[in-house]
Amino acid sequence: MTIAEASKKYEITADTLRYYEKIGLLPNVHRKTNGIRDYNEEDCRWIEFIKCMRDAGIEIEALIKYVTLFYQGDETREARRQILAEQREKLFIKMSKIEKSLERLNYK
């Protein structure tokens, strides 16, 4: 899948995909002999994961740590689990604040 196809499918700009690759969120993206990116199934799973996490408001720094640890192997499983648990807790706090805001808006 080309960058244009991935961009359209996942509703992410090509610049964002290039940025994710540059900062290490999408490492090892395969390229054709002419240098054009060729996203495979694994790359697409990472894009879906990153998009889901970013849509939820998870910080890029946390995702970079997670991806870096993932590629270090199974011995980092607990550290990765901890990163996701911390981000999950932050999301619950954020969700609680949003619910309170919605309650106020509904009251007005």
Task: State the predicted function of each range.
Residues 1-65:
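Basic helix-turn-helix/winged-helix DNA-binding cores
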Residues 49, 60-61, 70, 95-98:
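Short C-terminal domain-edge/linker segments immediately following a structured domain
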Residues 17, 25-26, 63, 69, ...:
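Generic detector of leucine side chains in alpha-helical contexts
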Residues 76-108:
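Short, charged amphipathic alpha-helical surface segments
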Residues 55-83, 87:
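Amphipathic alpha-helical dimerization/coiled-coil segments
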